Every structure is written in C-alpha cells, then in structure tokens.
C-alpha cells in the first residue's frame, strides 16, 4: 500500500495540437495561449457592462480596444498646459451647471490644491508637470499691498482667458 503523506500528482490531459505542426511550433502556440488571468481581464473589458458612451475619456476608449500586451507598453503621459486648461475649463463649466461628476476632483487635481480666493489662472501657473502645487512665495497672489490705503476692489474671477498660439495669455 502507498503511504498517505506522499504528495499526490495531478495529471492533466492536454489536447493534442494539429498533427501537421512540428513540436517547436506547437510549443510556441502553447506559450502564446492566454493565462486564466488574462482571459478574465479580456472578458471583463468586452462585457456589455462597459458602455463606451459612458466613458468620458476618449484615450480610455482607445485603450480598451487594445490587447493587454499593447496596454502594458503604454506609459502615462502628463497633460500639457493646454490640455490642463481645457480640463479645468470643462470642470468649471460642469460646476456652474451644477453637475459635479464623480471623481472630478481627482481627475483635474485642482480641487484640493486651490486655497479659497485664488483664481484658477493662478492655480494653473502653480501646477507643475506632475500636477502637484508648487509652494513658492511668489505664486501667492496679493489682494492688496501692505500699507496701501485702498483695498483691492477687483474680485477674483473664475474665467480663464484663452491662450494664444505661443501659450501666453492674449489679454
């Protein structure tokens, strides 16, 4: 009789590949077969629960159409100042309409980095390429000069003037 504490071996039956393939080609085909984990990922992405019209980011739509290997090669690209400005304008437009989308603060990165009373144009100038606020004394706006007898009557606006082709304010 066999001992009970010996490890049991599980044998799998592997369906034979086409008989006309040589063993090297058969091995390459076997290696290219997806693992169960990638099958779960691809089946989740092709499921009808994901509605492309509900996905706000067009970059994400194109990413869903890619294979897992192509998605793995892609790197995250930080947005340019123009793209950042467009995101902020879009976000402010939605706030004015009263439609605050879920996760909007995380996507633009301006919600938490802007202290009250600072216009959004100054937030953009403070944002670095990583999307985090730079803490420098020169970036803090002065509402009125010390010792000045007249306080500033200009209120901070939420309007962001458009940039000209060189990236400077056209105002």
From Swiss-Prot:
Residues passing through the membrane, by range: none
Any Pfam family: DARPP-32
Region (Essential for activity): 9-12, 42-54
InterPro entries named in the record: PPP1R1A/B/C
Renumbered residue ranges of the record's region Disordered: 1-171
PTM: Phosphorylation of Thr-35 is required for activity.
GO cellular component assignments: cytoplasm
Biased composition (Basic and acidic residues): 19-29, 135-157
Highest taxon, organism lineage: Eukaryota
GO BP: any one term: intracellular signal transduction
Phosphothreonine modifications at: 35
Residue numbers bearing the N-acetylmethionine modification: 1
Alphabetical UniProt keywords: Acetylation, Carbohydrate metabolism, Glycogen metabolism, Phosphoprotein, Protein phosphatase inhibitor
Phosphoserine, modified sites: 43, 46-47, 67
Chain segments carrying region Interaction with PPP1R15A: 143-171
GO molecular function: protein serine/threonine phosphatase inhibitor activity
Known role: Inhibitor of protein-phosphatase 1. This protein may be important in hormonal control of glycogen metabolism. Does not inhibit type-2 phosphatases.
Family note: Belongs to the protein phosphatase inhibitor 1 family.
Assembly with partners or alone: Interacts with PPP1R15A.
Protein name: Protein phosphatase 1 regulatory subunit 1A
Organism (species): Homo sapiens
Gene that this polypeptide is encoded by: PPP1R1A
């Amino acid at each position: 009789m066999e001992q009970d504490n010996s490890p049991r071996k599980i044998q799998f039956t592997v369906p034979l590949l086409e008989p006309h393939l040589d063993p090297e080609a058969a091995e390459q085909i076997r290696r290219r077969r997806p693992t169960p984990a990638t099958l779960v990922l691809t089946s989740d992405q092709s499921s009808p629960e994901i509605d492309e019209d509900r996905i706000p980011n067009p970059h994400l739509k194109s990413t869903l159409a890619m294979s897992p290997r192509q998605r793995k090669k892609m790197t995250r690209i930080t947005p340019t100042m123009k793209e950042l400005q467009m995101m902020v304008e879009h976000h402010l437009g939605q706030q004015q309409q009263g439609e605050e989308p879920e996760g909007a603060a995380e996507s633009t990165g301006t919600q938490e980095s802007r202290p009250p009373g600072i216009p959004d144009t100054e937030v953009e100038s403070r944002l670095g390429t990583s999307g985090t606020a730079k803490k420098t004394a020169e970036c803090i706006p002065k509402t009125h000069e010390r010792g000045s007898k007249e306080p500033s009557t200009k209120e901070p606006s939420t309007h962001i003037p458009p940039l000209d082709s060189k990236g400077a304010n056209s105002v």
